[in-house]
Structure formats: C-alpha cells, structure tokens
Amino acid sequence: MTWETVIGLEIHVQLNTKSKIFSGASTAFGAEPNAHAGVVECALPGVLPVMNREVVEKAIKLGLALDAKINRKNVFDRKNYFYPDLPKGYQISQLDLPIVEHGKLEIVVGDDVKTINVTRAHMEEDAGKSVHEGLNGATGIDLNRAGTPLLEVVSEPEMRSAAEAVAYAKALHSLVTWLNICDGNMAEGSFRVDANVSVRPKGQAEFGTRREIKNLNSFRFLEQAINYEAEAQIEILEDGGKVQQATMLFDPEKGETRVMRLKEDAHDYRYFPDPDLLPVIISDDRLQKAKAEMPELPKEMAARFVADYGVSDYDARLLTASRVQAAYFEEAAKESGQGKLTANWMNGELAATLNKEGMELADSPITAPRLAALVGKIADGTLSSKLAKKAFEAMWAEPEASIAEIIEKHGLQQMTDTGAIEAMVDEVLANNAKAVEQFKSGNEKALNAIVGQVMKASKGKANPAQVQELIKAKLA
C-alpha cells in the first residue's frame, strides 16, 4: 500500500515588543530567573491585564502580509489548565475570534511553487518554563517568559512531505523577520513549531489520526521529526494497530518521537471569554494606517528585481530571503550597474564563503560597495572570472584594501597586450598539434583544451574570450 503523509503546522511567533502582552514587564531574553516576572504573570490578587497596543499592530501587519482577513472585533478567552509555570491557572488566548483568518503563504520546493492556506493567527500570552538543571533533583519555575506576546499561526493540513513543511516554516520565518515583528531566533524560542502529522492510504479523502509533535526549534529537527513520526505511524497501521491521538516530543539525540501525553481536545480546556479584558476593536482608520505603513514584501521585491535588474526568478527569491540580503544586493547592483553579475557573485562565491566561515552577511568584510567595485572590474574586462576569484579571496583577507590596491598588490590585472597573447597562442598551437587536428575535425572540446593551455601559460591573466577568438581565427 502507498501511504500519504498529511501535515499541518502551528507556529508560535514571539513578537519583539519591549513589554509583555498584558503588563509592563520586560520581555528581554537572558535575565536572571524571575527578574522579569510581573505582577500579572505572577497572578497576584487584584491585578488586571492591560492590552499592549503594539501586539495588535504587529498582528495586523502579519495579516496584511498573508493577504488575510483582519477581524475588526477581537475577544480574548481563558484557556484553563494546571501547570506549575502558569500561576493564573489559565492562559489568555483567542478561540472563536482570532485577529487573522483565511490567509495564504507561497512556498517553493525544488521547481514547484505551492500555496499553503493559513487558517488563522491569534494573539496569546506565552507560559513560563520549568527549570530542572542544577537544582539537585528539584524543579524551579522561571516566569520571565510568561506573558511574552505570541502569535500562533495555524496552517491548513495541506503539506504532504517534510520538505514542504520545512519550506512553509522557512517562508513564514522569513516573512516575520522581514516585517520586523519577530527576531526569528529559534535557539531562544522566538519561533517554535508544532507539527501535526497523520498518514492515510494514497487517494483516501478522510484524514488519519494525527499526532502533534511539540516545540521543534530548528528546521532540521522539524524535518527529522516529521519523517520519523510518519514512518512510525505507517509501521503501526501496517502491523494492524491503531494510531492514538497524542502529544509527542522529539528527542534530537535519538532522532525519534515519543509520547508525552494523550492529546486533549479544545473542550478539555474549558475555554470561556476573559471577563477582565474588553474586546479590541480595529477601526477603519487604524487598518488604513497599517496598510500605508506596510513595507515592500519579499514577493513584490523579487518581481521588481527580475524586472529592473534582469536576474532570474530563482536568484530573486534567494536575494529576498531577508531584508539585509535584499538591501545589500540593491546597493551593489545600483553602484555597479550589473544586476545579473552581482546576483551571481552574491548567490555564488559570497554565499559559499559566508557559509564556510559561519558568518552572517551583515558581518561580511566584503561590503556592498566593495562587491560592486569587484563586479565593475569584471564587467570592464580588468579582471577575468578566474582572477576575480583571487581578488575576492584577497579582499576577504584585506578588508581595508580597495579593489585597485588588491589588483596592483597581487598582480591580478588581465592582460591587454594583444601581441603578447597572440605569441602565447602561436606557441600553444605549435606544441599541441593533436588537439589542433581534433578541433579541425569538428571536436569542440579540443578548443577548450587549447584555450586552457593558453590560460595556463598566461597564469590566468589572458581574457578567455579573446584567446578563443584568436585561436578560431588562426585555425579557420
């Protein structure tokens, strides 16, 4: 039997506000335990929650970017459950009236473009966390994270592979960081993924029983967890068993999922409207203001890069993966006047070097103006592609040096003396009679071999196109 995996994601996006969603306590990461535990988060008697306006603004911004419906009336609900890191005994969330509904997000997997529908995004508060390390077998409670504003973004179960789920998560991560509503730091818990996974026979309309894998904080873990869970469910079904609805944890060391608890449904949480919070009404003026303040979105910018700079759709998607990358490209392309060549170098040599060095683009010793200068020297014929790579390496190692200084210091200028190049061509032709005969017999590969010999003789400084023209002229 052929099985199909069905995946839906619930992603917790931690909003980068300075204060918490219902109190003025700080959201700064890394403080001493409970240093930012406010009176609301501690559930002290008589304290009341006060809505953080900025949370609403950021939620609207995401809704607009997802081309979603923005609900004008927002009601908060209490989600009741007992856990030590939740002193109130309930979490303030949104059940029936989320701020964002019916959005969509485009993903790319290989050569395929697919649109995933976003069911909803609702505002809620984060819980605290339990601390087990260094307490001699006891458990401590840290409420610094409690009350931190979250947007829980829920997709439709429309992904059919771990690769599609990762592409969706990456696309949403890119979007929320682009909008500057989340810092995207997965290691610090700013972007956490819950994956709902089920399997069914290929062609069956009815969904299988889903299991939810909680708190995946890297794209690699997301992929591993989904693949393992899908295989585990298939094995259960093929052995004649039944998959039980459950909440799962992923063990990254073993690369496997395990049951944390049997899954609860919404009625288990006894939701009811929070009597301490008035509905949040979004006016026409507020919505129009939010629309006017929206930045150019990645998809729009990618289309502009294709139109204005002549880059491919693929390159444009890479260049708009982040605002930093897009701004770098646009600055370098404008300065050099060479959009396509700039894109090739950014997505090629520069990206590879950054990856090798474990660096971010913002920290690159080759700034946008320096890359523009390098690209300009390639475009005007001063540097061949081979010499340009050597120049790039030198520029990386010597961040203060100009491209002119690099070329002079390392002797990288391309040969322009036609007479000297012609003499090298004559010598190579004389010493490679076999290759010459092969080329005359129609073997195009022989031409590449001859060009290679001339380039070797010139130590890479001859212009390959010029060399090829000279060889063809002499052998015509």
Curated annotation (Swiss-Prot):
Signal sequence range: none
Keywords tagged on the record: ATP-binding, Ligase, Nucleotide-binding, Protein biosynthesis
GO biological process, one term: translation
GO molecular function: asparaginyl-tRNA synthase (glutamine-hydrolyzing) activity; ATP binding; glutaminyl-tRNA synthase (glutamine-hydrolyzing) activity
Claim: Protein biosynthesis is one of the keywords in the record: yes
InterPro entries: Asn/Gln-tRNA_amidoTrfase_suB/E (IPR017959), Asn/Gln-tRNA_Trfase_suB/E_cat (IPR006075), Asn/Gln_amidotransferase (IPR018027), Asn/Gln_tRNA_amidoTrase-B-like (IPR003789), GatB (IPR004413), GatB_C_1 (IPR042114), GatB_Yqey_C_2 (IPR023168), Gln-tRNA_amidoTrfase_suB_CS (IPR017958)
Gene3D superfamilies linked: 1.10.10.410, GatB domain, N-terminal subdomain
Catalytic activity line of the entry: L-glutamyl-tRNA(Gln) + L-glutamine + ATP + H2O = L-glutaminyl-tRNA(Gln) + L-glutamate + ADP + phosphate + H(+); L-aspartyl-tRNA(Asn) + L-glutamine + ATP + H2O = L-asparaginyl-tRNA(Asn) + L-glutamate + ADP + phosphate + 2 H(+)
Pfam families for the chain: GatB_N, GatB_Yqey
Keyword set includes Nucleotide-binding: yes
UniProt-listed Enzyme Commission number(s): 6.3.5.-
Highest rank taxon of the organism: Bacteria
Family stated for the protein in its record: Belongs to the GatB/GatE family. GatB subfamily.
Subunit structure of this chain's protein: Heterotrimer of A, B and C subunits.
Matching NCBIfam families: gatB, PRK05477.1-2, PRK05477.1-4, PRK05477.1-5
The protein, known as: Aspartyl/glutamyl-tRNA(Asn/Gln) amidotransferase subunit B
Species per Swiss-Prot/TrEMBL record: Neisseria meningitidis serogroup A / serotype 4A (strain DSM 15465 / Z2491)
Taxonomy of the source species: Bacteria, Pseudomonadati, Pseudomonadota, Betaproteobacteria, Neisseriales
